[in-house]
């Protein structure tokens, strides 16, 4: 059974810039979700434990797509939509694991200390003559 396949990429300068932007968007989405959850929880405690205790992954994605992307955060459009979606999903999963007692409290990702990475959905990749075609990235 084939579980993973490792490939070596030789990106052009433009593609390398897009990879770095994708890693930055993923980190930003992860940190944004954690920050929003902390803010909502603080409001919940300050209001005498009345209202929402946390915010859902779907609500944050809708807020980013409908409010932030068209106005102040237009740079989010430069990378594939799955990159931002996966960053939010990873943060949501980290919080769920924390609340179940399976892991420690999730920390904000640092631009300089953490290894830049992002997830690419394998379904969005297709093999082409001499390379691969991905969401907003082609070889």
What are these regions (language model features)?
Residues 1-139:
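Nucleic-acid substrate recognition interfaces
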């Amino acid at each position: 059974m084939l579980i993973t396949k490792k490939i070596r990429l030789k990106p052009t300068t433009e593609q390398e810039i897009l990879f770095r932007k994708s890693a930055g968007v993923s980190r930003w989405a992860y940190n944004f979700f954690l920050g929003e959850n902390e803010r909502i929880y603080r409001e919940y405690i300050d209001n005498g434990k009345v209202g929402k205790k946390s915010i859902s992954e779907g609500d944050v994605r809708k807020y980013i797509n409908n409010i932030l992307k068209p106005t102040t955060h237009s740079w989010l459009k430069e990378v594939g939509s799955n990159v931002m979606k996966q960053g939010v999903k990873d943060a949501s999963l980290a919080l769920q694991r924390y609340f179940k007692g399976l892991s420690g409290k999730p920390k904000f990702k640092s631009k300089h200390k953490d290894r830049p990475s992002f997830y690419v959905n394998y379904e969005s990749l297709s093999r082409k003559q001499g390379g691969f075609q991905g969401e907003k990235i082609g070889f």
